[in-house]
Amino acid sequence: MLAIAILAAGKGTRMQSTLPKVLQELSGLTLLERVLTSCKDLTPDRSLIIVGHESNKVKESVNHISGLEFVNQQPQRGTGHAVQQLIPVLKGFKGDLLVLNGDVPLLKAKTINDLINKHRSSKANVSILSARLSNPSGYGRVFSNEHGHIEKIIEDRDCTKLEAKNNLTNAGIYCFDWESLSKILPYISNKNNQNELYLTDTIQKLPLAVHLEIEDAGEVSGINDKRQLAKCEQLLQERLQDFWMEQGVTFINPSSCTISEQCEFGKDVTIEPETHLRGKCIIANNCHLGPNCFISNAVIGKNSSIIYSVVKNAQIGDNVKVGPFANIRPDTMIQNNCKIGNFVEIKKSYISEDSKINHLSYIGDSEIGKDVNIGAGTITANYDGTNKHKTIIGAHSKTGANSVLIAPIVIGENVTIGAGSAISKDVSDNSLAIARSKQSIKDNWSKKLKGT
């Protein structure tokens, strides 16, 4: 049997935030959600989260995940004290206890499995993850014998100068035999510089303690402040981008771009500098994104390009060109072979194939037919101050520059709207609609003004 306990009670004072530390976000997910994700495939018998500071907020943040149990730690007196709170909760439990930190979000599922497997194959009372760090400051040091059995772990603040030179560190990830641990947990001491109960003090009291040294120390990077949060974001982005580059995606300047774990890319996609993808983005083959794009929860068809633009919660077809400086807002669908040009905003609209909206337009709550040409400066006036109204434009129609279509309105097929028109009534197929004042010219007007 397996129980998982996640330590999530701390305040995170160094974060300088109103949120508990485990609710800080890393690439769209909280630190706690990331830890839970890393162990979701273990199918544990018990999943326990030890909460304390702002416990209600922490509970609410994961209420969409079933099967979680919460254990309160008040006050917070160290990792050993946190795990002591499990003694009544796990009474009668026979099996292994995996202890994870809520502020170590980059741990891979494979690494956790490897630790559990080593723990069980070695029949140890406790197994820990260890890592060699070039700068081990802040981490407890692991001291083991020639057989790889741990003799002791000394917290950084309690190390002598000689002990501090050891760069084999405790990653803070443990797998215990619960029966062995529960017998000694009540007896750990707070005789240390922090007057806290350290979980590491149980190591020397257990008959057999082993460690698994991991190759990628970045996996066990802990987060205590915003600098470390930014560093973990960088590590996560490197991990994601390395994976997709192996699948054929080109990043021109990877360090300037960010993507989410939900993103999916086809072959021969190119991502230019300063391009950021959030949420679930599906990008088909041969797309060219950027530079300077923000794309969120979007589907982009093959051979499409987006430059200097924002796309949110929208679908874009094949062979579509967007930008520069376009804003594609939610619930927009742009079909194949369309062109959306500079300073165009589209919201909650359907743009049929082969249509062009090239310059300086606002299209909202609209249905645009096939092969429509929207002239520069055309807008759909969709809001009457209370409600939004729909504009429908039939296939093969075109609007002249600086036109206003006052919704609700239906423009038929093969219609031409004269430049500068404000159209407020439906227009039938094959018509020309003009709604503007007659031009008046006053000869010699300038001379009269000057009195000559």
From Swiss-Prot:
Region (N-acetyltransferase): 248-452
Region (Linker), start-end ranges: 227-247
Cofactor notes: Binds 1 Mg(2+) ion per subunit.
GO molecular function: glucosamine-1-phosphate N-acetyltransferase activity; magnesium ion binding; structural constituent of carboxysome shell; UDP-N-acetylglucosamine diphosphorylase activity
Cofactor: Mg(2+)
Origin: domain of life: Bacteria
Biological process terms in GO annotation: cell morphogenesis; cell wall organization; lipid A biosynthetic process; peptidoglycan biosynthetic process; regulation of cell shape; UDP-N-acetylglucosamine biosynthetic process
Enzyme class at the top of the EC tree: transferase
EC numbers for this chain: 2.7.7.23, 2.3.1.157
Reactions this protein catalyses: alpha-D-glucosamine 1-phosphate + acetyl-CoA = N-acetyl-alpha-D-glucosamine 1-phosphate + CoA + H(+); N-acetyl-alpha-D-glucosamine 1-phosphate + UTP + H(+) = UDP-N-acetyl-alpha-D-glucosamine + diphosphate
InterPro entries registered for this protein in UniProt: Bifunctional_GlmU, GlmU-like, GlmU_C_LbH, Hexapep, MobA-like_NTP_Trfase, Nucleotide-diphossugar_trans, Trimer_LpxA-like_sf
Residues engaged in binding UDP-N-acetyl-alpha-D-glucosamine: 7-10, 21, 73, 78-79, 140, 155, 170, 224, 329, 347, 362, 373
Keywords assigned: Acyltransferase, Cell shape, Cell wall biogenesis/degradation, Cytoplasm, Magnesium, Metal-binding, Multifunctional enzyme, Nucleotidyltransferase, Peptidoglycan synthesis, Repeat, Transferase
Region ranges (Pyrophosphorylase): 1-226
Function: Catalyzes the last two sequential reactions in the de novo biosynthetic pathway for UDP-N-acetylglucosamine (UDP-GlcNAc). The C-terminal domain catalyzes the transfer of acetyl group from acetyl coenzyme A to glucosamine-1-phosphate (GlcN-1-P) to produce N-acetylglucosamine-1-phosphate (GlcNAc-1-P), which is converted into UDP-GlcNAc by the transfer of uridine 5-monophosphate (from uridine 5-triphosphate), a reaction catalyzed by the N-terminal domain.
Alphabetized HAMAP family for the sequence: GlmU
UniProt-recorded name of the protein: Bifunctional protein GlmU
Species this protein is from: Prochlorococcus marinus (strain SARG / CCMP1375 / SS120)
